Amino acid sequence: MEFRLKQLRDAVAADAAGRVQEVRYFLDEIEKRADEMCKAERLYREGKLPKRVCHCDTKVNNMMFDEDGTVLCVIDLDTVMPSFIFSDYGDFLRSGANTGLEDDKNLDNVNFNMEIFQAFTKGYLESGKSFLLPIEIENLPYAAALFPYMQCVRFLADYINGDTYYKIQYP
């Protein structure tokens, strides 16, 4: 998260597309939460949180299903790297528990499905009980908030830079 915040701060400093003032409110909201959202890196530096082999792009689109809807495997393995379990847990919830599309024009469609959150968390904890550390389990709610926050930081940095990575279709 620290890396993504640095990218955003660099984008703000450069203001390449002249958009910083129009998004000042959002920048202030991001900065209010920055310290909290960098918790994983702090815990890692303190020796309290391990890095593990993670997929790092565990959205629903990167899962292959059979005709009955059963998950067969995870695809898009070029993103596998050492990271925190929060990466896979939080990123899946960002996409899987979202009731709308990532680029949904109608924000009334966008919500967080608590039933999916609860079912996924139950399955995640059952599957990971043999290796997850207490600090990882305690911070799963943080992970659920981290990835929407991270995407917001990424989208906003790109917008400030002039839509260089994410091509927008509408304001």
What are these regions (language model features)?
Residues 1-55, 60-68, 146, 167-168:
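ATP-dependent phospho-/nucleotidyl transfer catalytic cores
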Residues 107-111, 137-148:
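A short beta-alpha structural unit
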